[in-house]
Amino acid sequence: TMKLVYKASLQGNELELTRKIAAPNKESNVISFGGQVFQQQVFDGKKGYAVQQGRKTELIGKDLETAKKKMLPFEDMAYITGKLDRIESLDGKNTYVIIMEDTEIFYDLASGLKVKSVRKANGPKGEIKIPTNYSDYKEVNGILIPHKLDQGMGRFNLNFVLQEVKINEEVEDKDFK
C-alpha cells in the first residue's frame, strides 16, 4: 500500500491531493480545495465512482476499464502492454515515448525515470491534452518517488509538492468504499 499527500497553491488557496493505493488495482484520489473536498475518485478493484462538486457518478465504460487495467501501486508496470512510439528530445534530454491508450509517457533515456505524461481527454470544446511533469525524485523505503508534479489544468498550472508518503501503512480497505 501507499499513501501520498501532495499540496499546491491555486489563487491563494491551498489545494491538497491525497492518493491512497493498494495492490493490485485499488485507488482513492481526493482533491481538497480550501479545506473542502472538491473532487474524489475511488476504485475498489471491481467498481468505482467519482464525485465532482457534490455530484456522484459511477465509473462505467472506458473509465471503468482503465481503472481495472491499472497495476498499482506501480502503474508504470502496466505500460509493458504499451507501444514504444519514438525517441524525443525533451528539455535537452532524450526520452523514450510510450503510447498507452490515451496517454503518452516520456522516460528519460539516461535515468529510466518517468519525466512527463500527456493524457488526452474530452473537454467542453473537444479533445484536450493534460500534461504532467514529474521531477525531484527521492528514495523512500528503496523506491524512487517524484516529489514534484507539475500539471497543466486549462489556464492554470498546478505545482504539487509531496508533503507525506507512507508505504505499507495508513491505508485500509475502507478507503476504497
Label each region the model flagged.
Residues 13-16, 36-40, 56, 104, ...:
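Short, mixed charged/polar active-site loops
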Residues 93-176:
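Gly/Pro-enriched, hydrophobic low-complexity segments
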Residues 36, 47-49, 55, 93, ...:
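Residue-level signal for well-ordered, solvent-exposed loop/turn and beta-edge residues enriched
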Residues 40, 50, 59, 84-89, ...:
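Hydrophobic, aromatic-enriched alpha-helical segments typical of multi-pass transmembrane helices
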Residues 49-75:
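Acidic/charged, solvent-exposed loop-and-adjacent secondary-structure segments enriched in E/D, K/R, S/T
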Residues 1-54, 83-84:
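N-terminal mature ectodomain segment of secretory-pathway/periplasmic proteins
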Residues 37-39, 46, 56-59, 155-158, ...:
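Catalytic loop of the DD-peptidase/beta-lactamase superfamily, centered on the K-T-G motif
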Residues 65-91, 114-116:
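Short, conserved active-site entrance elements at the starts or edges of catalytic domains
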